[in-house]
Each structure stands twice: as structure tokens, then as C-alpha cells.
């Protein structure tokens, strides 16, 4: 109806989050009058959701005349150039997961009795790629509390307040608590994963601990602005050796192997790096 060159999906956010988003102002007709990417001092709480609907003609023109970053270049250039840029206020579920903490919180929110995003609403189905796997199995020795267990999982240990993607295995005596574990990761018998995010195909060896200690406030020394709330992250296909103890706010690189660990203890705030030929750790 408004013959927009581009329409942005927008919604209100807490001002405390606005500094890490694209913030905009709109007039009474819904036309966008200002757009600032990650402002230090936000003038508005209206944020872009990162969803843009362009007319084909406008998209071709502005991509050829502007740099390719939509939030940083294309949208601001269109507004300055007089293009018809409008905002659509979205009132449904949406979460920005641009930080490790917000990603973890969005997953933990799914475990609430009445989550804002209802995964079981038949009127709003979630369409996503999903392999055909066997149903999830809860073994005789398992204990599961307030968790999401996907298809293909085998749980023989304890899972508390956690989200398990398809194909995750939790061995006898293992504990997964307050964590997100992605596809086909294996938690061996007796291992503990606490307040952690494990990428795909990670193996945690028998008796190993990922997320040890009560001091959540020691930030990661390489990336203190990103990893500072007690969450430990483990990269894709990393292997945590038997008995290794890993503290809080630790980053384990993808494909790390036993030879990359300088000792059996990785202190809070450290990073374990993987390099071709040999690995090294930055404590």
C-alpha cells in the first residue's frame, strides 16, 4: 500500500540491549527517518530485527550504489537518498541472540512452564531441517528434569535444565546441567557439563568436567567482552580428554585434541587453541 522500496521488521527492545542492535526512528506514517547501527547512546528503543523486504528494483539499485552491509551502509544510504523505507512493527516472539549470554538465555527460556515461544503450538509449526532418527531413549539409570531431549538422543545419566539436540549421548553417571549440547555430541560416563555450550560432535571424556568452580566472574582473557558470565564454550568436534577439568568462561577451539591441553586443569578464563601440527593453550 505504501509502495515501499524496503520494509524493515522492527520491535521494541530494552534500552540496555539497544547498543548492540540497529536502532531506528519512524514517523506517524511508519516511514523510517533515521537508522543507526549499534549506537553508543540510543535515541530510541525501536530495533531492527534484521528482516528486510525489498522491491527488486530498489535492491538492485542500492546494492550497486552502496557497500554491501545492510545495517551499516545500505539502509542508512537509502534513507539519506530519499528512498521509501518503512518499518513494520512485529508483536510476536523474537529474541536477539547476538551474544553468548543472550543465546543461552533464549534456550533456557524454552524450559519454562509457559515459554513465550510455544514449541507445541499446532497453529505455529516450526519448519526446520530434521533428519529421520530413532525416538529419544531415556535409560533405566537416567534422571531427567526440566529439559528438552531431541530425537535420536540416548540418556543414561542425569540431565537437568538443559537442551539436547538430536543424537546427543549422555553416559551412565554423567551429568549435564544448565547447558546446551548440539548435534551428535557424546558425554562419556562420569563426565560433568555445567553451564556450557557444546557445538556439534563434541566428545567429553570419562570423568572430565566442563564448567568447574563457583567463580563466574573471571572473564575470558582473549575475549573478555564476549565470555564473562560463567558460560564455557566448546567448539565443533573438539575432544575433551579423560579426567580434564575445565573452569568457567573458558573457550575450547574446534577440533581440539588431547595433545592441545598443556595440563589436566584449564583454569577459569583460559582458551585452548588448535593449530595444524600441534596445539597450544593460552591460560
Predicted regions and their residues:
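Conserved core of the sugar-phosphate nucleotidyltransferase
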Residues: 1-56, 65-66
